């Protein structure tokens, strides 16, 4: 819940000097990316910008405090300020910020700018007190913001120092409007106006000018002088002489003498107590100070000129001038030290009553009241956890004694989930084990079950499926039906374990159950996870179309719940890329993989390994070995600088081994084979993939017997577990083994099986990747004209893809080849006496490559009737009567020239 006063522009006060010269400068702010107002405290930055903002509608205001160094809090308020300026135009960003569904501030801002692209009128965003930001991540994100913000948006930053926002670059490009302390300082004329409206007896212009010079036009000093002159009999000039040369860090003594010592004791205590509040309203004041009619008291303080300002148009929220507020808080620690804990407790209670637990925690921490902090956490911690207030929760839990956590195991569980969310898996188990050792009777019942559900999640994340299964089953046995979150976790883990074991049907059912529960209780990240798992399972079973449809449901969920920036989004677009690649939709597959990299742009480069492997796979399917090599260099660098799950390593190894096969790099394959992991089992698609990598390397090295043993065992497992996509891949690799070993009939047999199975999987690129050896076999099958219709159609499609991406599109009948052919001593006399034209040679090459007449016409960009003429002519010159005879003739010519066909 956001505090309204932090998003309200300060109300323009009566008796303020209108800074006409500065307002004139600010009138052109819409021509700049950044308007920067910098000066020490008390120079009137906020007052000036509130005057400038008066009457503007398309403006958002965000007043910072120390707590805004938390990235999530900063994001929530900044987006809320933009929503304020645009009347709710950026709904997607607002939801993402509220639910913390973004990868980083920069990615959230990128989405913001997409939405703002449709907002065409001038827009202003004011951030006050930016000097309070010390978080380097926020600084970097705001630099990104300024670089990429729309042209019609102007950012207005108020700060006591020069912020780390790339100011020099903006200045050079004339995109910065600056107002500093020298310009903010009051002129003689402004000082005279100020005193005239503050003092009952006007002072002479010369006197006013001298006072202004004495304090260098410092607005706060002028305000103190006016206050002192009203409260005392001595002259304004005497106060000015005392203030001359004093700056904000040396004001304490003066403020004690001239302000606190000149108000009655009740007002003094009111000021000191209320100052602990970063913002205040009637209810807070009444509870903290003990005075009735808090609103009236605040208005009275405002009228006395005691540095109190309204924060919103309703007049409900107030705050002290930062300079005066800091002074009062320091004095409160000195003068009311004994009462201070009780004052903070009162503030915490009032904030809680108004529904602001994070503010209440701030005061409970300041009070050092562990019991109050514990009670707030017990009631609100999980809500704060679900809203990613992780830093605040961590600080709060550290402030509680261990005994308090033991007395409230829910807080131990919360601390463990915090650790899990930060991937500190070892610490989770240590914490839970310590708690179980020290908490009596916790080894049974609901809390123990919740511990086990979390432990199960940690175990599966850490690559221990057997332990994860044991713990998930224990949790589900003990958890009551109403403990939905832990039941969702345990069910999801159990489904993932069964997936790892290759029990796909049972795993699919559990993941569907997880999805149903997660949707019912709005646990969207587990709903998304379960859909991704379902898609992977369906892919493994060979039901790629159903996997596609499940992915569509996942994309719809992401759009509806604005989950675009969760890391799981990358997982989804990556498995979509794998499916598109299988279907030879390479451009779409590549685009999907690149979008996955974009999702992970704010994370460590190692996280991009899988998408990078997918890009390499696309290059390999196109036969683009130069590009594949370039990308492989980066992939191998990432492999050497990270620790990865075995599935990730297997996918990375796959593209490496295929590349070595295509380039004939036996040395690299042999070296890899000596060192690579050889899994104990092959009962899921991760392990099948690694063993397939091993078999491919063995085939490249001529170790056919070893490779055949591996592949036969893989096929046995794949058939028994119904891993149909793996079976399809295994058959293709077995085909290559038989072909290279000279076992042509066995090669044809398993190729026919692979083509038949591809009717279910839809595989294309898995055939294409095998290149010319696959093309030769498919040409022979097509020539035999015995394939069923579906297999015939698929074989022709695969052949077209190979011809497009591997070797030459026109077989080998280019100009150089034809010249060498005609000079060959064994060339048929018919060809020598009646030579084909260059175009007819091209047509012959395309016929040999399996192209139909329509496809040849499309390839050569001529009419189909023209192609028929070319075919008739070349048939006559070759002395053949039909297409199959032409293919056989071309094959003889290629063999004569030394090409293996």
UniProtKB/Swiss-Prot annotation:
- The protein here is known as HTH-type transcriptional regulator MalT
Name of the gene this protein is made from:
malT
Pfam families, A to Z: GerE, TPR_MalT
InterPro entries in the cross-refs? P-loop_NTPase, Sig_transdc_resp-reg_C-effctor, TPR-like_helical_dom_sf, TPR_MalT, Tscrpt_reg_HTH_MalT, Tscrpt_reg_LuxR_C, WH-like_DNA-bd_sf
What does the UniProt function comment say about this protein? Positively regulates the transcription of the maltose regulon whose gene products are responsible for uptake and catabolism of malto-oligosaccharides. Specifically binds to the promoter region of its target genes, recognizing a short DNA motif called the MalT box.
Keyword Nucleotide-binding found: yes
Q: Which UniProt keywords apply?
A: Activator, ATP-binding, Carbohydrate metabolism, DNA-binding, Nucleotide-binding, Transcription, Transcription regulation
Which SMART domains does the entry mention?
HTH_LUXR
Q: Which residues bind ATP?
A: 39-46
């Amino acid at each position: 819940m956001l505090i309204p006063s932090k998003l309200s522009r300060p109300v323009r006060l009566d008796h303020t000097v209108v800074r006409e010269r500065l307002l004139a400068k600010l009138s052109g702010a819409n021509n700049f990316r950044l308007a920067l107002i910098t000066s020490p405290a008390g120079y009137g930055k906020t007052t000036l910008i509130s005057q400038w903002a008066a009457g503007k509608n398309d403006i958002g205001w965000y007043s910072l405090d120390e707590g805004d160094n938390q990235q999530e809090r900063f994001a929530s308020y900044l987006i809320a300020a933009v929503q304020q300026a645009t009347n709710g135009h950026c709904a997607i960003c607002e939801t993402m910020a509220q639910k913390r569904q973004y990868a980083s501030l920069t990615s959230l801002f990128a989405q913001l700018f997409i939405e703002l692209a449709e907002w065409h009128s001038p827009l202003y965003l004011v951030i006050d007190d930016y000097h309070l930001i010390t978080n380097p991540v926020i600084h970097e994100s705001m630099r990104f913001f300024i670089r990429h913000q729309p042209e019609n948006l102007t950012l207005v930053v108020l700060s006591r120092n020069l912020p780390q926002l790339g100011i020099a670059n903006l200045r050079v490009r004339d995109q910065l409007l600056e107002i500093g302390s020298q310009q903010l300082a009051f002129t003689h004329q402004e000082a005279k106006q100020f005193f005239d409206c503050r003092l009952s007896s006007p002072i002479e212009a010369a006197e006013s000018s001298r006072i202004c010079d004495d304090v260098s036009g410092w607005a706060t000093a002028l305000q103190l002088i006016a206050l002192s002159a009203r409260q005392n009999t001595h002259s304004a000039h005497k106060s000015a002489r005392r203030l001359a040369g004093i700056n904000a860090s040396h004001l304490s003594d003066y403020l004690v003498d001239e302000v606190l010592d000149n108000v009655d004791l009740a007002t003094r205590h009111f000021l000191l107590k209320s100052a602990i509040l970063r913002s205040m309203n009637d209810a807070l004041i009444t509870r903290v100070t003990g005075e009735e009619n808090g609103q009236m008291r605040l208005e009275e303080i405002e009228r006395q000129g005691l540095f109190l300002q309204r924060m919103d148009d309703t007049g409900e929220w107030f705050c002290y001038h930062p300079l005066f507020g800091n002074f009062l808080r320091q004095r409160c620690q000195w003068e009311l030290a004994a009462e201070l804990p009780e004052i903070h407790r009162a503030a915490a209670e009032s904030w809680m009553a108004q529904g602001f637990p994070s503010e209440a925690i701030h005061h409970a921490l300041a009070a050092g009241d562990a019991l109050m902090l514990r009670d707030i956490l017990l009631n609100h911690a999980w809500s704060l956890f679900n809203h990613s207030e992780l830093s605040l929760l961590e600080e709060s839990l550290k402030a509680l004694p261990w005994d308090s956590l033991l007395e409230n195991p829910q807080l131990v569980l919360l601390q463990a989930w915090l650790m899990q969310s930060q991937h500190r898996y070892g610490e989770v188990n240590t914490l839970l084990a310590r708690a179980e050792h020290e908490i009596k009777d916790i080894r049974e019942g609901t809390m123990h079950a919740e511990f086990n559900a979390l432990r199960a999640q940690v175990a599966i994340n850490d690559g221990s499926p057997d332990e994860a299964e044991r713990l998930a089953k224990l949790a589900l046995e003990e958890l009551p039906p109403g403990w939905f979150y832990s039941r969702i976790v345990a069910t999801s883990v159990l489904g993932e374990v069964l997936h790892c074991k290759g029990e796909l049907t049972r795993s699919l059912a559990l993941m569907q159950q997880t999805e149903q529960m997660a949707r019912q209780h709005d646990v969207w990240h587990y709903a998304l996870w379960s859909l991704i798992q379902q898609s992977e399972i369906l892919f493994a079973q060979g039901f790629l179309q159903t996997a596609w449809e499940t992915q569509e449901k996942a994309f719809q969920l992401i759009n509806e719940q604005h989950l675009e920036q969760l890391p799981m989004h990358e997982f989804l677009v990556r498995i979509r890329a794998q499916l598109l690649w299988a279907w030879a939709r390479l451009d779409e597959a590549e685009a999907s993989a690149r979008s996955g990299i974009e999702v992970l742009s704010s994370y460590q480069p190692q996280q991009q390994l899988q998408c990078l492997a997918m890009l390499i796979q696309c290059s390999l399917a196109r036969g683009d070995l130069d590009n594949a090599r370039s990308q492989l260099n980066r992939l191998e660098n990432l492999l050497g600088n990270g620790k990865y799950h075995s599935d990730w390593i297997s996918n990375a190894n796959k593209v490496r081994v295929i590349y070595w096969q295509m380039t004939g790099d036996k040395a690299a394959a042999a070296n890899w084979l000596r060192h690579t992991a050889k899994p104990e089992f092959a009962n899921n698609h991760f392990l099948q993939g690694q063993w397939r990598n091993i078999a491919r390397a063995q085939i490249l090295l001529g170790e056919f017997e070893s490779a055949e043993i591996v592949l036969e065992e893989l096929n046995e497992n794949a058939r028994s577990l119904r891993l149909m996509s793996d079976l399809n891949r295994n058959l293709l690799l077995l085909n290559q083994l038989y072909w290279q070993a000279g076992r042509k009939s066995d090669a044809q047999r398993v190729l026919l099986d692979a083509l038949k199975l591809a009717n279910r999987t839809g595989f294309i690129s898995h055939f294409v990747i095998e290149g010319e050896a696959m093309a030769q076999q498919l040409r022979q099958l097509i020539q035999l004209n015995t394939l069923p219709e579906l297999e015939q159609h698929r074989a022709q499609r695969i052949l077209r893809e190979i011809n497009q991406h591997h070797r030459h599109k026109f077989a080998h009948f280019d100009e150089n080849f034809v010249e060498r052919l005609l000079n060959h001593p064994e060339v048929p006399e018919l060809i020598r006496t009646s030579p084909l034209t260059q175009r007819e040679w091209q047509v012959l090459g395309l016929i040999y490559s399996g192209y139909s007449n329509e496809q040849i016409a499309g390839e050569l960009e001529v009419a189909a009737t023209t192609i028929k003429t070319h075919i008739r002519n070349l048939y006559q010159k070759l002395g053949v009567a039909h297409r199959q005879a032409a293919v056989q003739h071309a094959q003889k010519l290629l063999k004569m020239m030394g090409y293996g066909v």
